[in-house]
């Protein structure tokens, strides 16, 4: 989302026939909502006498979650830029052998970026999940369900962005590059999946 774009405007764009914003932007905003909910739990815990012992920890979490929220929000534009670069590369002329070679090189360059951008989103969503675990354990019990929604939102963002990694990595000729990214992605998914289940159960036990 642009700096002053409303959520309604973003969703109108998402629903339109325009190719961007698309799933990559939705993944980033899902992660950003997770980070925002982590911040919410922190803000509703800090300053409460009952939670004075964890206040210092949650102030640190809050600083990190706000940084991650800004990063993820910025990734919406990164996704659009990466998509546009791929489409632009495919649109290059291919009338001569030289043009074909230049076009192929540009496509591969753009696909590498289009693989790395959603992978970066996955990494940041993974960080949000770590912070969600902290607030699920230490946060104000009155808003502990929001910690659960935080982890679910971040996990959804990670898994959603992962689909774009798969799509773009598939088209790469540099298989070593692709396999390196896919290996990292599988690790992120495995770690986040286990954490997602654990944190959800932690939150559920506190609200029941």
Curated annotation (Swiss-Prot):
The chain crosses the membrane at residues 25-46. Pathway: One-carbon metabolism; formaldehyde assimilation via serine pathway. It catalyses: (6R)-5,10-methenyltetrahydrofolate + H2O = (6R)-10-formyltetrahydrofolate + H(+). Its EC number is 3.5.4.9. Signal peptide: none annotated. Disruption phenotype: Mutants are unable to grow on either methanol or ethylamine in the presence of glycolate. Glyoxylate restores growth, but only on C2 compounds. It comes from the Bacteria. The keyword Hydrolase applies. Keywords: Hydrolase, Membrane, One-carbon metabolism, Transmembrane, Transmembrane helix. It is found in: Membrane. One of its GO terms (cellular component) is membrane. GO terms for biological process: one-carbon metabolic process. GO terms for molecular function: methenyltetrahydrofolate cyclohydrolase activity. It is a single-pass membrane protein. Belongs to the cyclodeaminase/cyclohydrolase family. Homodimer. Required for both C1 and C2 metabolism. This is Methenyltetrahydrofolate cyclohydrolase. It comes from Methylorubrum extorquens (strain ATCC 14718 / DSM 1338 / JCM 2805 / NCIMB 9133 / AM1) (Methylobacterium extorquens). The gene is fchA.
